[in-house]
């Protein structure tokens, strides 16, 4: 599918249980945003369950699904990188397979790009139901490093909805 408007890249590890729900929800959102001009790149990170088999079945039955199988568990970052190397869309949406962050936010994110933003990413402001250690570690490992790397060298425009 040359000239795709959108690629959704999804690293997956032991996600067989939720794969059908991810497929259903992401398909609806992508269709609503760009019609038929999209792909969903699912990258398997050496899962021990039937994630790869489910991904392969989806890629056979749905022309929008591209399935990648890594030979072993390389970790989230390298799996994401493999997915990014395979995607062909003008815009790329990165989503974890566990659906902790809803794919239904994609229309809001693409609207921000339509408004002129080159890069749009989401970050939860309120983390309900998580213990203090998880909140603190999320800030230290994600929030602080993002804050440090982006605020020092790049102009940012924060938009909160």
Predicted regions and their residues:
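N-proximal low-complexity "stem/linker" segments adjacent to membrane-targeting elements
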Residues: 1-28
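A conserved acidic beta->alpha catalytic loop
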Residues: 44-52, 99-100
